[in-house]
């Protein structure tokens, strides 16, 4: 929880603010903190949930999809299959009907046929 005098992190770690740090806080909200000097602190998912007093949401679970693109590879329209390497598979965070979210930030949009554009 982020308060006016310090922070209690989700892992239990405590941080006490100095008088100057405490005086610099302008507003504490659900997603972060705005300081009088114009800087801000953006909460990550766990910190925002902790600050709001809600338990963290579970990470998405991989599930089998009825489409040609999945976590382990792709079935191409010509009938050939391409198996992903372990690194390529690990880079896929979430695969859905309209695209894939990757850990390296290069998200993939799918066509109506479920193939990468």
UniProtKB/Swiss-Prot annotation:
Residue spans of the sequence repeats: 1-17, 26-43, 67-84, 93-110
Which keywords fit this entry according to its UniProt record?
Cuticle, Repeat
Q: Which domain of life does the protein's organism represent?
A: Eukaryota
On tissue specificity, the annotation reads: Calcified shell.
Kindly indicate whether the keyword Repeat belongs to this entry: yes
What GO terms are given for molecular function? structural constituent of cuticle
Q: Which InterPro entries does the record associate with it?
A: Cuticle_1
Disulphide connectivity of cysteines = none
One Pfam entry for this protein is Cuticle_1
The protein depicted here goes by the name: Cuticle protein CP1243
């Amino acid at each position: 929880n982020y308060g006016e005098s310090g922070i209690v992190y989700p892992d239990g770690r405590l941080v006490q603010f100095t008088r100057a740090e405490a005086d610099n806080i302008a507003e504490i909200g659900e997603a972060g903190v705005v300081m009088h000097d114009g800087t801000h602190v953006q909460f990550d998912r766990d910190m925002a949930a902790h600050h709001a007093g809600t338990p963290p949401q579970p990470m998405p679970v991989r599930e089998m999809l009825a489409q040609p693109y999945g976590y382990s590879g792709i079935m191409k329209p010509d009938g050939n299959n391409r198996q992903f390497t372990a690194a390529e598979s690990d880079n896929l965070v979430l695969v859905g009907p309209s695209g894939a979210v990757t850990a390296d930030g290069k998200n993939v949009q799918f066509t109506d046929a479920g193939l990468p554009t």
